[in-house]
């Protein structure tokens, strides 16, 4: 996202947070605003002329705002209308940045609602585990990544996988990401995990362990990693019995291989 667009997004995040903090129903308003912003983006994705008109610098701000109100007024909640109107009054580098910005705002609204319910950490972990499930099911990922299938078809497929297993926030975030793919499904979901963690100022540590980690083990590992990296760390783990023992930890692009399998590979390499 270009500089002008980043500045616009920062202002809109403040507008969104202010509105959510002032409402008596933060959960309901956050959920409605988030899902409605996703719907707005879907409309903009399908209409190039509209998205160009809404950021056209040749049109004055009032004209762009009135256009947005004529399209969405009475069809979305007051909170969503306020965000969309504020968005089109900003300067965006291109239409893609506008749409990506609205997606981020939709996600933020949903996550603020989840946080108000004490569910943000759960959402983060559910997204991580969902990514791992899809990663282990190549046929499922292939179907979810099929650009020949409509966004609705991909969402319907994932909805069947998710039904009754995750929070409504996790479901809404995952379905939106799968319906609007920019990269592989697993990568989309992993990006979401990073985004959720970043709201709490945390960096994600992805751990593959030979045996399931208990909460105390995760907490101890998190403390150690925080001392190494000098920032808050969110530990998410999965079981990989092929490691034989120990664990492999990935933080960003850095990998710490403390697994038995890794030690054996290094030993063989040194002997060879």
Swiss-Prot record:
It is found in: Cell membrane. Coiled coil: none annotated. It comes from the Bacteria. InterPro entries: ATP_synth_OSCP/delta_N_sf (IPR026015), ATPase_OSCP/d_CS (IPR020781), ATPase_OSCP/dsu (IPR000711). Pfam families: OSCP. This is ATP synthase subunit delta. It comes from Corynebacterium jeikeium (strain K411). It is a peripheral membrane protein. F(1)F(0) ATP synthase produces ATP from ADP in the presence of a proton or sodium gradient. F-type ATPases consist of two structural domains, F(1) containing the extramembraneous catalytic core and F(0) containing the membrane proton channel, linked together by a central stalk and a peripheral stalk. During catalysis, ATP synthesis in the catalytic domain of F(1) is coupled via a rotary mechanism of the central stalk subunits to proton translocation. F-type ATPases have 2 components, F(1) - the catalytic core - and F(0) - the membrane proton channel. F(1) has five subunits: alpha(3), beta(3), gamma(1), delta(1), epsilon(1). F(0) has three main subunits: a(1), b(2) and c(10-14). The alpha and beta chains form an alternating ring which encloses part of the gamma chain. F(1) is attached to F(0) by a central stalk formed by the gamma and epsilon chains, while a peripheral stalk is formed by the delta and b chains. Keywords: ATP synthesis, Cell membrane, CF(1), Hydrogen ion transport, Ion transport, Membrane, Transport. Belongs to the ATPase delta chain family. GO terms for cellular component: plasma membrane; proton-transporting ATP synthase complex. The keyword NADP does not apply. One of its GO terms (molecular function) is proton-transporting ATP synthase activity, rotational mechanism.
């Amino acid at each position: 996202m270009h500089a002008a667009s980043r500045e616009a997004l920062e202002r809109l995040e403040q507008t969104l947070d202010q509105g959510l903090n002032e409402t008596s129903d933060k959960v309901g308003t956050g959920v409605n605003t988030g899902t409605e912003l996703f719907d707005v983006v879907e409309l903009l994705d399908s209409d190039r002329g509209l998205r160009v008109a809404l950021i056209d610098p040749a049109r004055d701000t009032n004209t762009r705002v009135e256009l947005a109100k004529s399209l969405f007024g009475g069809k979305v909640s007051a909170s969503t209308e306020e965000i969309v109107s504020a968005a089109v009054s900003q300067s965006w580098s291109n239409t893609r940045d506008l749409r990506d910005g609205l997606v981020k705002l939709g996600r933020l609204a949903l996550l603020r609602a989840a946080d108000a319910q004490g569910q943000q950490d759960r959402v983060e972990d559910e997204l991580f585990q969902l990514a791992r499930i899809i990663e282990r099911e190549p046929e499922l990922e292939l179907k979810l990544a099929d650009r020949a299938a409509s966004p609705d078809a991909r969402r319907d497929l994932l909805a069947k996988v998710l039904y009754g297993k995750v929070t409504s926030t996790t479901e809404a975030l995952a379905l939106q990401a799968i319906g609007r793919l920019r990269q592989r499904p697993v990568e989309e979901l992993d990006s979401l995990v990073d985004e959720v963690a970043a709201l709490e100022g945390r960096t994600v540590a992805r751990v593959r362990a030979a045996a399931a980690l208990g909460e105390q083990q995760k907490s101890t590992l998190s403390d150690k990693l925080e001392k190494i990296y000098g920032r808050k760390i969110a530990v998410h783990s999965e079981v990989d019995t092929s490691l034989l023992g120990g664990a492999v930890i990935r933080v960003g692009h850095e990998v710490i291989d403390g697994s038995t399998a890794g030690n054996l590979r290094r030993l063989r390499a040194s002997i060879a």
